[in-house]
Amino acid sequence: MAGPSRRRRRLHLSKIYSYTCGKSSFQEDHSNIGGPGFSRVVYCNEPGSPAAERRNYAGNYVRSTKYTVASFFPKSLFEQFRRVANFYFLVTGILSLTDLSPYGAVSALLPLALVISATMVKEGIEDWRRKQQDIEVNNRKVKVHDGNGIFRQEEWRNLRVGDIVRVEKDEFFPADLLLLSSSYEDSVCYVETMNLDGETNLKVKQGLEATSSLLNQDSDFKDFRGVVRCEDPNVNLYVFVGTLALEEERFPLSIQQILLRDSKLRNTEYVYGAVVFTGHDTKVIQNSTDPPSKRSRIERTMDKIIYLMFGLVFLMSFVGSIIFGVETREDKVKNGRTERWYLKPDDADIFFDPERAPMAAIYHFFTATMLYSYFIPISLYVSIEIVKVLQSIFINRDIHMYYEETDKPAQARTSNLNEELGMVDTILSDKTGTLTCNSMEFIKCSIAGKAYGRGITEVERAMAVRSGGSPLVNEDLDVVVDQSGPKVKGFNFEDERVMNGNWVRQPEAAVLQKFFRLLAVCHTAIPETDEESGNVSYEAESPDEAAFVVAAREFGFEFFNRTQNGISFRELDLVSGEKVERVYRLLNVLEFNSTRKRMSVIVRDDDGKLLLLSKGADNVMFERLAKNGRQFEAKTQEHVNQYADAGLRTLVLAYREVDENEYIEFNKSFNEAKASVSEDREALIDEITDKMERDLILLGATAVEDKLQNGVPECIDKLAQAGIKIWVLTGDKMETAINIGFASSLLRQEMKQIIINLETPQIKSLEKSGGKDEIELASRESVVMQLQEGKALLAASGASSEAFALIIDGKSLTYALEDEIKKMFLDLATSCASVICCRSSPKQKALVTRLVKSGTGKTTLAIGDGANDVGMLQEADIGVGISGVEGMQAVMSSDIAIAQFRYLERLLLVHGHWCYSRIASMICYFFYKNITFGVTVFLYEAYTSFSGQPAYNDWFLSLFNVFFSSLPVIALGVFDQDVSARFCYKFPLLYQEGVQNILFSWKRIIGWMFNGFISALAIFFLCKESLKHQLFDPDGKTAGREILGGTMYTCVVWVVNLQMALSISYFTWVQHIVIWGSIAFWYIFLMIYGAMTPSFSTDAYMVFLEALAPAPSYWLTTLFVMIFALIPYFVYKSVQMRFFPKYHQMIQWIRYEGHSNDPEFVEMVRQRSIRPTTVGYTARRAASVRRSARFHDQIYKDLVGV
């Protein structure tokens, strides 16, 4: 144990500091505590006291498994039999135990048992893995106070509410803890929350001064007692309301004192904490809700096909039972027996009694439903699950979607939506971190009305290209750019006027100094000094913030240390010209949030002056300037607009001196608001800070570049050529979003922009003088009018409506999404080539996604990288998360994760198309083979006067779907490629086969079913007629049921497998093995099964070796049936490919006929793949060609005088 003196000698003050006061006062009403939602009471260090035990809080054992040992079988069986097909086979299996069954119970129940068992084994394995993870977590060890001043190792699962624990460096917190003290004197600790929100930057927590001063070592806890009264368990990770009672005093608690389970202690030797929430009451577990259940369109269509097949089965059973009942009633009795005596088993009179014909018909109905159950593909669901899992593995292991820089491959987090990737109609994309890198670089700034920095952004280059000029250069700049030295991450600034200390020679040096000081002081970054090199790096809450601190350092204002109440930095002194160290006392941090759109700090400089330093969005900051602080406003606004035009992210910087009395009053109100435990505490804090952040003096503005990711314009171009619509939903300013649209080729020069915003003079006037209701009414009317004008403009343009782009801001979007207006908005948006929604909130992103999904009825894909994109990702049919620098929340909420936007091209055009094509073909073929098999059963049943006698042996029936036809279908679903990846890129319109659902339309489904019916007719009638007069016995006996059934079954196995071989576009050795292996296995099985004793093999005893194999007619019949059964497919395919080829078939001809290197032939086909769209650089080049042609036409007309 370390005593307090030793601890203070070793670690006097932390290098990691909190920005809220550790000493809290309690002067606010706390009536919520003890009321609804705030009823939790924690007896610290007394978990076993009677008062604590009466509370009966949850233990710390966490179970993430779906099943327990006791519930596995009943619960998993219930899950399986919720599927209609499985329930149907269960019912038929139960009926097979009765006299109604046409076959043995074992052969009826075995296939169902195999399918159910396979799925249950899969469920069991997945749940066992979860169980192992639970065991590993629950058995972790942590030091727990035993009540006598000693901490002993204890497993996490045994923790109780009120326990005192000691967590050491790099350990995870075992529960939600109240931070009591740490190894640092100021009771702060550094916490990594990647497991909670995915963010990699470290968070700072600080205990109360009241506990940190009392609890310095293990022995101090022997007599420690305290009572926490706080909120009940909830999902809010960022808010905690409670109080701590120590002796006679109470202290307010906030999230700043709470250490959440599954976060990790970093850069701190140890902390002491009291357990507040355990197990499933912890915030991380409260947040671990299941993502929304998503099902693909193909799956939903498949369910309808299953219901159709059920209807067909019941219809056939009904018709057959009616016919059977009529024939039974008319069956005459002669000489003590009926005319159809040969149909009646000895012990089954009731089924064939002419006196009880209606009852016989009813019994036959149940027999027929069992007999025709083979129309329903019992193994379809499990086969599709296997295929989708294997497809997901291929996606995960695709080296072309692996991002080496961050070591991140693609990750299919769910396999349910693979085929949906090939059906996407609209992509809704975030901008920052998705289209751009979210790696900010300080590139320009405006100080005292003068622009600095001459770096050229990607957007400016795109603007120059589209205007036909040279890259934009600021006319005010006449400087020499110093290109020496290595490039600094986060800093891409070029301007010698302010670099290398030259700023001191500028006329506005005093303003420049204040500007750079603000960059060095107004932030929440943490400096970390490398002990070997002495270099300082920064841990910041956002890439923007890190870029500002790095920029300040490069300008000569190096922030190098932070204490609990101070910020230290080095700067060049204006008077002496030497580097000096300055320490500003940090008094308050007014934190940034999306509502305030600004952050400020209140500091006392080394001259004793109180300063408020603030930075924020231009629309928020300009309205807060004092009358005497607007000296550079017009010029700064102009520069901000220019920066936005260049696609840069801007912030405005301002400051003011604060009067001592004003600060005292503010600080009192501010601390009281922070100490409040009322529900409106955050609103109260915002109100108080709003009053302080007024009458500011403008210094200038910053501009940072978030560059487009590599390959974004090319990816967007290819997706546009595939016919996919792309919407951008961003929180950025309209000007920034528009110019990113140009840089990414979403927009181009000739595209007409329909801009909808509320920047009209009327609205601005009302915002200054009108009431809230009046503003809302005028705003709504303005949005409606602008939407109507946009629709009229589109209507007037006629067929060229794709040349329009819709751009709408967040305020207008609020009204456009209202129930009465949203259809008008959607109609306009879907008629435009590009849509950009600016200043969008996370909720608006989700609502727009929902509107597009429900309004168009087509597949939507949302892609984003931040926590603000989670709602959008979960609302879309497919959510794609970018594993970028904003953390992992988007990835954790997504269906598929990729590292770069450009990988979306391969994910959709290649994997999406392949998965769609494979699954569609697989399901169609499944129903084809089952109809082929089932119709032969029905025809034989009709041929035998609906006697209920099956055409095939029991085991033949049972094993058809399991062993003789399923593996080739699975191989098709995993390996087939109708078109190679190279041709998917070359002919992007191929993707429209999925969007238009060409390969799984009802026309194609019915066509495959009809093909199965034709195959069954050929098999049954050819087999029946060819064997009718054939002898299969030395005694002269003709073919019986076992001979006809064996021959028909052989033909079915050959036909369905050869049909599969004909349907495959891309053969692999696996497909050869499973197709020819399935056929060979039938003969092997027939020989082995037929060689078994007659009691087991029944009528199949020696049928192959003694009857079928020696008979030439068996082999000739099989050959001719195969040919005649497949001829209709050959004829159809030939006519269809000759006169009505699908697009993938045209591309296949290019490959098969050797035209892939014939430029003219390829260009002819490729032209069909290029849609007349204005999105993408291909469209831009085409427009350039058209402009050039018009230009030359005009010159020609001028020359000839036309």
From Swiss-Prot:
Major site of localization recorded for this protein: membrane
Membership in a protein family: Belongs to the cation transport ATPase (P-type) (TC 3.A.3) family. Type IV subfamily.
This protein's UniProt keywords: ATP-binding, Cell membrane, Magnesium, Membrane, Metal-binding, Nucleotide-binding, Translocase, Transmembrane, Transmembrane helix
Keyword Cytoplasm on entry: no
Stretches assigned to the Extracellular side: 96-99, 328-364, 941-954, 1028-1040, 1091-1107
Transmembrane segments annotated in the record for this chain: 74-95, 100-122, 306-327, 365-382, 921-940, 955-974, 1005-1027, 1041-1063, 1070-1090, 1108-1132
Cytoplasmic side: 1-73, 123-305, 383-920, 975-1004, 1064-1069, 1133-1202
Listed CDD domains: P-type_ATPase_APLT_Dnf-like
Membrane topology per record: Multi-pass membrane protein
Annotated protein name in UniProt: Phospholipid-transporting ATPase 10
Organism in which the protein naturally occurs: Arabidopsis thaliana
Active site positions: 430 (4-aspartylphosphate intermediate)
Documented EC number(s): 7.6.2.1
KW Mitochondrion (keyword) present: no
Alphabetized GO MF terms: ATP binding; ATP hydrolysis activity; glycerophospholipid flippase activity; magnesium ion binding; phosphatidylcholine floppase activity
Lineage per the UniProt record: Eukaryota, Viridiplantae, Streptophyta, Embryophyta, Tracheophyta
